[in-house]
Amino acid sequence: NLFQFAEMIVKMTGKNPLSSYSDYGCYCGWGGKGKPQDATDRCCFVHDCCYEKVKSCKPKLSLYSYSFQNGGIVCGDNHSCKRAVCECDRVAATCFRDNLNTYDKKYHNYPPSQCTGTEQC
């Protein structure tokens, strides 16, 4: 769920998920349109696409089990829905960590009017 995703983000990046990722670029936060603006925004785009694939599992609410091991995240559920949602969140949190070097504050509160073009999942 979103609280577990937030915990993953903190653990993987050291950043506050609300201030750092809730309104970044064209896809980090609610909704999304246009082309992702950088690698971090693309992490959010891929996460949105992943949630779309598992929407019947109610990904924003679904509780799953996971742990942090050797600097990474391990999803623990055998339940297919819970595991799928966990994997969406794990991949995104890891993507944020892997792209910290290109994270750019100019994309905070990015105006939606600048989000043009189209991108397919």
UniProtKB/Swiss-Prot annotation:
Coiled coil residues, start to end: none
EC code(s) of this entry: 3.1.1.4
Active site (record annotation): 47, 89
Cysteine disulfide links: 26-115, 28-44, 43-95, 49-121, 50-88, 57-81, 75-86
CDD domains reported for this sequence: PLA2c
Binding site for Ca(2+): 27, 29, 31, 48
Keywords from the named record: Blood coagulation cascade inhibiting toxin, Calcium, Disulfide bond, Hemostasis impairing toxin, Hydrolase, Lipid degradation, Lipid metabolism, Metal-binding, Secreted, Toxin
Highest taxon above the source species: Eukaryota
Transmembrane region(s): none
Localization per record: Secreted
Tissue expression: Expressed by the venom gland.
Pfam families, A to Z: Phospholip_A2_1
Reaction(s) this enzyme catalyzes, per UniProt: a 1,2-diacyl-sn-glycero-3-phosphocholine + H2O = a 1-acyl-sn-glycero-3-phosphocholine + a fatty acid + H(+)
Primary location: secreted
Cofactor comment: Binds 1 Ca(2+) ion.
Gene Ontology cellular-component annotations: extracellular region
GO MF term (any one): calcium ion binding
GO biological process, one term: arachidonate secretion
Cofactor entry: Ca(2+)
Keyword Hydrolase: yes
Complex formation: Monomer.
Function summary: Snake venom phospholipase A2 (PLA2) that has low enzymatic activity, is devoid of lethal activity but has strong anticoagulant activity. PLA2 catalyzes the calcium-dependent hydrolysis of the 2-acyl groups in 3-sn-phosphoglycerides.
Similarity comment text for this entry: Belongs to the phospholipase A2 family. Group II subfamily. D49 sub-subfamily.
Name of the protein: Basic phospholipase A2 RVV-VD
